[in-house]
Every structure is written in C-alpha cells, then in structure tokens.
C-alpha cells in the first residue's frame, strides 16, 4: 500500500472526453448530473473544463445517448418490476441521481398509475421472504422494511391488520412510528 497521494490523470481534450463519456454510458445508463460529475475529474478546473463538459453533454443529447426522461422511465420500471419498490423510494433515488422534480413527478404518476400500492408492498415482502410476524419486535421489523421500500404508513398498517395482529401490537407500532416521525421532522 502506497502512502503517496494518487496522481491526478492528465486532463482530456474534448474528443477524448467524448470517448470517455460514451464508454461510461456503454457500461450503464446515467443521468446528465451523474455524467457531468464523472467527467469533472477528467478535465481542467474552471471554465475551460466546464465548457468541454457542456459541449460533450450537448453532443450526447443530440445523438440521444444521454436522455434523463428515458433514464427516469427505465429506472422506474426496473425498480418497480424487479425490486418491488414503492413510489416514495423510487422518487428519492431519482432525485439523488439528479433527475428534475417535474420529470420525476410525471414519470412516477405514469408508472404507478395502475399499480396497487398494497399489492406491490405484499410482493416486496414476498421478495424479501418475510413471514407473518408473531410478536411486536418482528412487526416493527416489517414496518421498517416497508418504510425503506417506499410505502406509506396507511398501506403498511393495512397489511399488518390483515394479518390479524393483536391490537396492542398495532397500537405500540403506531406510537413508535409517531415518535420516529416527530424526531425526524
């Protein structure tokens, strides 16, 4: 293990930066923000480097190699079908990746238009191989799992009630969730 700091690579000219960006997009889809962040390490600091990045991004958009709306649609479909994530989780992930708020809203409204959130939450539990909880501790684990999965508390408690859990357990979980929400707000 070397203690010397890593040597910064030589800044790329515009044509090499374009090839670098195409290679990065060839490995996986990226948003404009992600690609700009990736290219920033390969150019000079300041306006000169930013001008190269902007030129490459514009060229990639014109060639339709880089398209945030196509990315958002594909990402949402994959998260919904494969991971069985709820709308909130996908919204947070798209936002973290730099997709615009309006685009996220329209994409999610279209993708989750004919999807039952309760059915999706049950599929998420099946995917995670979660069994019906037998005590309060396991019930709290299920609640946390579904909240992380992007499902609303209304749907979560509807599922818990359908499992005929004792009223004391549901009441305890509701107070725990209310306390957690008060702390995080």
Predicted segments, located by residue:
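An alpha-helical, amphipathic repeat domain used for nucleic-acid recognition
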Residues: 1-185
């Amino acid at each position: 293990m070397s203690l010397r700091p890593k040597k910064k690579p030589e800044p790329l000219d515009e044509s090499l930066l374009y090839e670098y960006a195409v290679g990065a997009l060839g490995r996986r889809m990226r948003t404009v923000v992600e690609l700009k962040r990736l290219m920033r390490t390969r150019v000079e600091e300041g306006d000169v480097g930013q001008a190269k990045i902007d030129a490459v991004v514009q060229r990639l958009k014109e060639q339709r190699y880089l398209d945030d709306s196509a990315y958002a649609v594909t990402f949402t479909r994959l998260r919904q079908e494969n991971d069985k994530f709820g709308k909130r989780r996908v919204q947070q992930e798209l936002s973290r990746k730099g997709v615009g708020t309006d685009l996220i809203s329209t994409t999610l409204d279209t993708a989750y238009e004919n999807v039952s959130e309760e059915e999706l939450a049950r599929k998420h539990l099946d995917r995670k191989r979660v069994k019906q909880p037998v005590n309060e501790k396991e019930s709290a684990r299920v609640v946390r799992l579904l909240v992380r999965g992007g499902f609303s508390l209304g749907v979560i408690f509807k599922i818990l009630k359908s499992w005929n859990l004792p009223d004391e357990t549901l009441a305890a979980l509701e107070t725990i969730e209310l306390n957690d929400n008060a702390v995080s707000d």
